[in-house]
Design a protein with these regions (language model features):
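N-terminal beta-alpha lobe that positions the nucleotide/phosphoryl donor
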Residues: 1-147, 151-172
Length: 172
């Protein structure tokens, strides 16, 4: 299962983070490595905004999490946040409970969850639920859980690639 291309630069100086962005290309997102919930995130669309974005992301990361380590990630165009709930038992059985769309957000926090996702076609649903089951199997997971994906919805295509975000060890 793919993840969004990104890295935690070994050189965490402003220059080192800038070089990571240069390698990845724009548009990009700078994120607080210790963070979540949208804190310490900065969208970088043009070269002129890189330095200011690095400094702002680092300040917010330190203030919110006490850690200024930054992560750089490629921006996924037109994203949808789609989650698949799974259940796995002690006998190796893993099943999915289909998907829900959590794309309606405010400040990177979910506001509305919709199931089934209006953006997911039957073919994409089959690929995503198969991937969610594969994630649980690869981790030898036993319990109920939620596998989160970011789906890239390109203009003119509803079969865009999707990327693994995280797995929560509970139903959400």
């Amino acid at each position: 299962v793919r993840v969004v291309p990104g890295e935690t630069p070994g050189d965490q100086s402003d220059r080192g983070v800038r070089q990571a962005i240069d390698r990845m290309g724009l548009p990009a997102i700078i994120k607080a490595s210790a963070g979540g919930g949208g804190k310490g995130m900065r969208l970088v669309l043009d070269v002129g905004a890189i330095d200011e974005s690095i400094q702002a992301a680092r300040r917010e990361a330190v203030a919110a999490f006490g850690d200024g380590t930054l992560y750089v990630e490629r921006l996924v165009a037109h994203p949808r946040h789609v989650e698949v709930q799974i259940v796995a038992d002690n006998h190796g059985h893993v099943m999915h409970l289909f998907e829900r769309d959590c794309s309606t957000q405010r400040r990177h926090q979910k506001v509305i969850e919709e199931s089934p996702s209006p953006a997911v076609t039957p073919a994409l649903r089959a690929r995503m639920t198969k991937a969610a089951v594969a994630v649980a199997r690869a981790a030898n997971y036993r319990n109920a859980g939620t596998v989160e994906f970011l789906v890239e919805m390109d203009a003119g295509s509803d079969e865009g690639p999707f990327y693994f975000l995280e797995m929560n060890t509970r139903l959400q």
